Structure formats: structure tokens, C-alpha cells
Amino acid sequence: MIEKGIFKNTFSNLYDSYKEGKKGSGNASRTGSPMGRSSNPIPISAPHNITIKSGNTSQEDMIKDTKHGLLVGRLWYTYAVNPINGDFSCTARSGIQIIENGKITGPGKSVRIIHSLPNMLKNISSIGNDQRKVIQWASLPSITPSIKVENISVNSI
């Protein structure tokens, strides 16, 4: 999708790829049933089954290098607000920790994040040397390191 900061390709499934004469990226799921196990709906392309390459910064060092921020363990309810511009909205509602002067000072409250994906990608300041599986409902897991993003506005909910 993105390689060395350059946009290379979109999510695709075999159905859309065949229509466009391209190779599928393996990012398909079926909607309309629990656990995505119905064969009735047409597969849609979705952001899952993605691997983000590790960087060289530990999560501990990212925290030490943060004056004021949040450590977010999981995002919920991520929706495209304006798909053309890449604007999205999501909720961080569990596993939030407050970072002050390079130290975790306690748990945080749920917040709403409304941002632009292109701007968020420009504001990545470090990528962790760790890897973890992230599962979106019944999808195949994505594999991602810790990612530190600067200048994200959050609203309490």
C-alpha cells in the first residue's frame, strides 16, 4: 500500500482486482453475517490482513520522548468521515494511559479522534521495533508495531 512514504496501491480483493485487471492484495471480507462467514454478499475490500514493517525504536523510548500524550492500546468504531480526503473518526475507549514528561502517569478516559489519514501519516515520528497482531472483529489479523504520531487532536466523550 505505502512503501517508504510513497502510496503504491489500494486495498483490493480478487473480485475487484479481476474487474480492473490487477493482482489482488488479499484484503477481502464478506459483510452481512456474524463472523463474516456468509457466501451471499459480494466480498468487499477492507483494511485487514496488513503487515506494517517494524522500525527501530522501542515503545519505552517513544514514551520517554513524549512530553504530553496518550498511549492508546486499541481503537474502536473507526469510520470514514470523508473517504475522498481520508478523514476518519475513531474512539479510544480502553487501555488508554496518560504520558507526562516521558512517564506514564495513570489511566486515561475514553476519547474521540477525528483526523485525516494523509496528515496522520505525515506526522508519524517513530515506528516501534515490536510487532503485535491486531484483530478487527472476525477479520484476519493485521500485524503492526507501535507507532508514535504527533499533533493528533482528541476530544473527551
Question: Model-flagged regions — what are they?
Answer:
Residues M1-I157:
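Dual-mode signal for accessory low-complexity, basic/Gly-rich regions
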